[in-house]
Amino acid sequence: MESIPILIIAFNRPDRLINLIESLRATKPPVVRVAVDGPRVGRPGDPRRVSETRAAVQRIDWTSDVATLIHDTNLGCERAAPAAVSWVLNEFESVIVFEDDAVLGPQFIEFATRALREFNYRNDIFHVNGYNVVPHDMLTNPAATARLSRVPGGGGACLFSGADPGA
């Protein structure tokens, strides 16, 4: 069964990206794509922080199937994130997306993979979302729930290339 790629969308927060990478290390996803937006003009600290963020990608050392999309100039979240998702969906049928400040619970990748496979052929479902407001030290609690909603939210998102968002 083909692995579903992980897409990490990052910018200028290397410490947050490192935390996400370390949380991914527990499940070691075999296919990882990372998109890093460029520094903003007129923000003196951005070039250094963006450079450190790009360097942090090297911590993904559990797989050789890592590719990066590096923007030299800043596109902003409203353009960089959709460009990153399109970049991955040009190669794969679906993707699990994380922003750089996400920290995953141990079951999320399995949940997302199962959800993508189960709902992949339903045109009325555009994405599956994971969000947990439980404090970080409680994430090891084995009690996990899922619910369906018509309103998308933040957190980890699992996207399908063939879904019709207007359905």
What role is predicted for each listed range?
Residues Q107-A143:
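Conserved donor NDP-sugar-binding/catalytic core segment of glycosyltransferases
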Residues M1-T27, A35:
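N-proximal low-complexity "stem/linker" segments adjacent to membrane-targeting elements
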Residues A26-L69:
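Acidic donor-binding segment of Leloir-type glycosyltransferases
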Residues G153-A167:
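Conserved nucleotide-sugar donor-binding
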Residues T73-A80:
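A short, glycine-/small-residue-rich helix N-cap motif at loop->alpha-helix starts
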Residues F92-V103:
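Short beta-strand-to-loop acidic/aromatic patch adjacent to the donor-nucleotide binding site
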Residues P82-S94:
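Active-site nucleotide-sugar/metal-binding loop of Leloir-type enzymes
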